[in-house]
């Protein structure tokens, strides 16, 4: 499972209602994961495996690299 926590850069407060989507790279494991919206804690959970890819928040690149566990991104 991969979880993403979205926080505001300035305050560190959670971002509620942000759309988070994932795009994985790789010939076999590549592809996109449908977006989900963060809860009141700024968290969203995907029942998927780990791998190299990009986390998008509201359509903007928030992190590129290996995605696993609980990823914290700032917007």
Feature-to-residue mapping (PLM):
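A short, amphipathic beta-strand motif
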Residues: 2-10
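Polar, enzyme-active/binding microenvironments
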Residues: 37, 63-66
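Short, acidic Ser/Thr/Gly-rich low-complexity loop/linker segments typical of extracellular
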Residues: 27-43
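Extracellular beta-sheet/turn segments enriched in Thr/Pro/Gly and aliphatic residues
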Residues: 65-75
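Short, ordered, surface-exposed loop/turn motifs in non-cytosolic proteins
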Residues: 11-27
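Short Pro-Gly-centered beta-turn/loop motif in secreted/extracellular proteins
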Residues: 45-54
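Beta-strand-rich extracellular modules
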Residues: 58-60
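Intrinsic-disorder/low-complexity, polar/charged segments enriched in Ser/Thr/Lys/Arg/Asp/Glu/Gln
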Residues: 1-3, 41-45
């Amino acid at each position: 499972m991969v979880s993403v926590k979205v926080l505001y850069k300035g305050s560190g407060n959670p971002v509620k209602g942000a759309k988070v989507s994932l795009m994985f790279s790789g010939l076999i494991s590549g592809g996109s994961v449908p977006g989900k919206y963060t809860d009141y804690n700024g968290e969203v959970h995907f029942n998927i495996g780990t791998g190299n890819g990009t986390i998008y928040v509201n359509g903007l690149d928030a992190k590129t690299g290996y995605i696993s566990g609980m990823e914290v991104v700032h917007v």
